[in-house]
Amino acid sequence: MVRPVQVGNKTRMSFAKIDEVLQMPDLIEVQKKSYKWFLEEGLREVFREISPIESFTGNLALEFVDYRLENNPKYSVEECKDRDTTYAVPMKVKVRLTNRETGEIKESEVFMGDFPLMTEKGTFIINGAERVIVSQLVRSPGVYYEQQFDKFGKKLISATVIPNRGAWLEYEEDSNDIVYVRIDRTRKVPITVLLRALGYSTDIQILDLLGEEEKLKATLDKDTTKSEEEALIEIYKRLRPGEPPTVESAKSLLYALFFDAKRYDLAKVGRYKFNKKLALKARIANLKSAKKIVNPVTGEILVEEGEKISKEKAEEIQNCGINVVEVLVEGKVVKVIGNNTVDINKYPMPYDVSSLNIKEAVNLSILKEILDNFSDEEAVINEIKNRMDELVPKHITKDDIIATISYQLNLTHGIGSIDDIDHLGNRRLRSVGELLQNQFRIGLARLERVVKERMTIQDVNEITPQNLINIRPVVAAIREFFGSSQLSQFMDQTNPLAELTHKRRVSALGPGGLSRERAGFEVRDVHYSHYGRICPIETPEGPNIGLIGSLTTYARVNEYGFIEAPYRRVDKTTGTVTDEIVYMTADEEDEYIIAQANEPLDENNRFINEKVVCRLKEEIIAVPPTEVDFMDVSPKQIVSVATSMIPFLENDDANRALMGSNMQRQAVPLIKPEAPIIGTGIEYKAAVDSGVVVLAKNDGVVEKVAADKVVIRTKDGRRDEYNLLKFKRSNQGTCINQRPIVNEGDEVKKGQVICDGPSTDHGELALGKNVLVGFMLWEGYNYEDAILISEELVRDDSLTSIHIEEYDAEARDTKLGPEEITREIPNVGEDALKDLDERGIIRIGAEVTAGDILVGKVTPKGETELTAEERLLRAIFGEKAREVRDTSLRVPHGESGIVVDVKVYSRENGDELPPGVNQMVRVFVAQKRKISVGDKMAGRHGNKGVISRILPVEDMPFLPDGTPLQICLNPLGVPSRMNIGQVLEVHLGLVAKALGWQIATPVFDGATEEDIQELLAKSGFSPDGKVQLYDGRTGEPFDNKVTVGYMYMLKLHHLVDDKMHARSTGPYSLVTQQPLGGKAQFGGQRFGEMEVWALEAYGAAHTLQEILTVKSDDVSGRVKTYEAIVKGENIPEPGIPESFKVLVKELQSLALDVKVITEDNQEIPLKEFEDDDDSDVPDATLNINIEGREDTPPEEVYEEGYEEGFEEESEELPEDIDFEPDSFDIENDDLDLEDFDI
């Protein structure tokens, strides 16, 4: 039943029945571990691959000996964010240049650029922005066999040999039993051509090698080549059509394609997959031997003729150096050929080589050669070390190719297995480290070319390593990866869960992966091998569904990049579940029978049930306890972190659970975070691992606590200082604020939470608020999932969040002189400057609204030609003040708030600024947003809705004791959505609140319906959890009882303030001259084709005409209309829309001359702006262009022919109508324009 559990420094009442045998691992280990590997191993590997770089003549060689990263970054993480720089350290490489003619050696240390460092939280700071590198799920290198059926139902087998990089080999069969090969996606040739080219030139040799196979004979009949030379030339013609083929060039091409480690790379994982697939042990197990098999080293008979080969024997055969075994299948003798590798630790070696720690299988022929040539132990071990690259080759070998062909032929007889490419045994993760290593390799390959060229050009005696190496390509490759790769993403920082999930994300998209358009259903589907590795619930809705996933809670990634899941071993002899934990990849797991975590055990850890329900591959089976191999570690292991935070997940439909997981990531941090009453027990772990809380580094006593600093004196008398982040802006504009939760004099332990971050409450993740909800209708205000809330939530700031926006102003050098940040702004009243300091920068604490100046800035205007008199006056009285215009930074439309921080950077102070920028001011404006109508809220079960009305507290329905509800939800939102978890949460919440408990109900192992009913009865509630409610307006009881209780509700990032938008005039598109669209562009609302039909249907001709002309793209018409409105005159006739002129131009470009003719055959001239000056004409009066800046004063623009539309009296054209006019300077006596606001 319920038992108290300590979570951080809180106690929760847990309903868990299963004891956790394994601690959950560090949740961002994927990132950290991978990057650590890169710095320690990955870089070294790349340098080793590329060095030495030799000149074309071979007399110079450049080696990369060693590298080091300096350990002190120039700026701290926070400073990098402030200064827009990258958090990086310099990388120094030790380089040795050898002149082989003179024997001269020059060594020096070369700077190889700044290398971005990973922060403690597993992120990178690139140009001041925090970014995450997402792991990519790609197809693993290896050999894949698949089968199709032709139109007669005949089985055709095809194979693909995929390296990490290099040429693909593809085998395919046709209906006539001929086996073809494609090399590097070119035209196909019979497979025997490839065998001949590899040295098996005659038909007899080929049949001897692979056995008398029908398919082989058919292929040999089809094959026109008869010798190695002919075969090589045939292949060369396919690979290089149009080039004159020679045997030599064909040989070297084939060698370069497959057997050159620089061109063909299997990577460690490819070699592992090849050996696993092609090794004999997996292929001959459980088959009958056609001959007796003798151990070639000891002479011992392993298997008699006709005897079945057991798994153990198969492994022994493989590791004693036998590569070919003949087996009997339906009375036929079939040759099975391995790829000639053995496990060196199991091979009968004369010496002990376990000290070498070789995990991979090694090439037998090379191993034999070493053993034949060397006799004493030390020499053998040294030689093995030196020839490691040959023993475990990175490229494909002749043995591999023959083994793959043998496998293809064996499949006809049912020997071997078809591969499923969606199985996680065949897909692997490329994490940060590997992705970076690949980029670095590209950079170094470019560098290699440069070095080789410079070696030939420069004087041999003068050359130094420094002037050979140009680090640009390396730096560029790394910068390009971090800056613009699809996998380098701007971190989702809405709340701590969003951060954590982003770092654990797994994407099948990106370079070398799939594309959204090509990915079919199979790839996106949940696969049985995802169990315990990738969450079946958490994936985006929309085009990326199933292509982006999330790692499960206990998953980890092994050295080959395969995802492993943990299991407890079951001791089969006694039938006891042990506490030994085994991590297995998906293909290893396929061989075992695995029980679920919630299978009941007795006190001795033995299975209670006669039959245990287990998994075997995709089957669910019931077996006796003696057959079970493993057992799950925890019920949580199949879901991701976000999903495991949904209580009663087992009672929710998967589609809604998916929405619930995704919406928790969009919850906005509130002012007063509150941990859920009904949690799942994982909140603490998630908050701690997300890195937003502050943990004590050592045991000690708290000496000082301030809002922004905590000091702890440790046992050995040192003082640890912790500086807290106060009201910083996150990537998504939410507020990051840390608050101490310890007091002076408290004793703290190492690893204890001493400060809460955003959305955390005493070290637990707290994304929302516990509110009293009732499932009832109220006057139709909860129609279609709308939510009715009480004013109490607004008044108490329960759902209030702080949002911080950042605005930048830069003073640059222009052609006409430098811009200046100043308080002296032309045509601006003192009122607008009241909050600016003497530099023209707003003071901290000022309250600003849309249009207010944040930073005063002026830009020089173009000087007009001076008259002779003016020149004379200038000469006498000195320089007149330069003409300047106002380009101040203002608060954009619809924004307002309080200035919380101002940062000023200038060249004079030695700050690094972009070229051409002399000064930069950054202003942070914070807004306190209370919950309002139109905001989106959601529970954790995918139950989302928009707030429709905020009701006074006194009108809300109330409980018998007078407590008003805080939220009314629509009961119809439950049945069809099948997310019953929310109802159970509400019932349990009611009880928990009454008992004063905080509850943990873990997923798949939480409170049952019976538990809840028992508690309801114990707390004195009705067993159905329903309560009689009363109408707040009349005090009358409602007809029916209502389900009432506490639910955890989140306020999501879709806030109405960010979506409200209105425009009168604004920027226009350049070609069509129609208003832009979207809030970001300050655009208009699109009036599309169907809306036009609606107006046509009602015959609203004038409305329609003005929508299509003056409100859109009739350029001169809209200026005149604006003028007319401003002066209070009648609106003139509309002109011709610009888009019509564009159409005419397009028709003219097709050589069709188009004229517009009136009813009485008069041609209407289409005015065109051909003069250079007039390119931007009409907007000039409004001073509107795309950026919404004024460019040229109207007087210069309006020349002949454009003024005709204006009345005589306005000699002065409107000087300063901006596209958001607040004031006009039109000198017109009979019109006071002060109060116009359009």
Swiss-Prot record:
Q: Which Pfam families match?
A: RNA_pol_Rpb2_1, RNA_pol_Rpb2_2, RNA_pol_Rpb2_3, RNA_pol_Rpb2_45, RNA_pol_Rpb2_6, RNA_pol_Rpb2_7
Q: Which domain of life is it from?
A: Bacteria
In terms of SUPFAM superfamilies, this protein maps to:
beta and beta-prime subunits of DNA dependent RNA-polymerase (SSF64484)
Q: Which GO BP terms sit in this record?
A: DNA-templated transcription
**UniProt KW keywords:** DNA-directed RNA polymerase, Nucleotidyltransferase, Transcription, Transferase
Fetch the InterPro entries from UniProt.
DNA-dir_RNA_pol_bsu_external_1, DNA-dir_RNA_pol_su2, DNA-dir_RNAP_su2_dom, DNA-dir_RNAP_su2_hyb_sf, RNA_pol_bsu_bac, RNA_pol_bsu_CS, RNA_pol_bsu_protrusion, RNA_pol_Rpb2_2
Instruction: Give the catalytic activity.
Output: RNA(n) + a ribonucleoside 5'-triphosphate = RNA(n+1) + diphosphate
Give me the ranges of the annotated region Disordered.
1186-1238
User: Nucleotidyltransferase among the record's keywords?
Assistant: yes
- Chain intervals with Acidic residues compositional bias: 1193-1238
The family database entries (NCBIfam families) matched by this protein are listed as:
PRK00405.1, rpoB
- Alphabetical list of HAMAP family matching this protein: RNApol_bact_RpoB (MF_01321)
Q: Which family does it belong to?
A: Belongs to the RNA polymerase beta chain family.
**Protein's name in the database:** DNA-directed RNA polymerase subunit beta
- Tell me the organism: Thermoanaerobacter sp. (strain X514)
